[in-house]
Amino acid sequence: VMQAHPALLRAFADSGAVMIADSRVDNLRRVSEAGLGLPTMLLRAPTPRNAAESVYWADYSLISSAESATALSHAAASAGRRHSVVVMVDVGDLREGVWPDRAVEVVTQISRLPHLGLAGLGTNLACYGGVIPTAEKMRQLIDVRQQCREATGLPLDLLSGGNSANLPLLASGQMPSEINQLRIGEA
């Protein structure tokens, strides 16, 4: 919606935004060209065909499969860099992510890819299936992260709890403290 408009990007940066995320690589290119120095996140899982431009313009990518991760790892190798990924876990919305009972397996596979950094886990609610974010859904994500930590030995520091639909949960004080990122800004 904002299409990486420079004035809006500056307003976000001046207001304390610590990262800019977008679902379109072209907009992330504009973010980079704006020179804010903020890390960027690609919200749409990249296809193997656009993995190279995803790695070039985004610091982080949300992914839902080992196949996407493999494509990003190859692209990062070709670019001579590391790329950070957030593995999405579907805790009920039926839109994106690996099932909780497969998360350890998928995260373990991804952790072996040489040119990726596994930043953490995320989820998306109140989108396709209309599942409302709750403290219980967030705790489910926290539990999956703990299982993945134990299996891989990785910190998985980033725990992205969802989008703007999570704001009521945050405002009510019911958001678990382990959730340290929300992707705010619905279209």
Where are these regions (language model features)?
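N-terminal active-site wall of soluble small-molecule enzyme domains
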Residues: V1-A58, L169
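Active-site loop/helix belt of alpha/beta enzymes
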Residues: Q3-P6, R10-A11, S15, H83, ...
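Short, acidic/turn-prone active-site loops that include or flank metal/cofactor-
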Residues: R24-D26, R44-R49, A66-S68, V89, ...
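Active-site-adjacent beta->alpha loops and helix N-cap segments on the catalytic face
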Residues: V25-R30, E67-R81, G130-Q140
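Short catalytic-loop micro-motif centered on adjacent basic/acidic residues
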Residues: T40-L42, S61-I63, L158-S160
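A generic, well-ordered mixed alpha/beta core segment in the N-terminal half of proteins
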Residues: Y56-D93
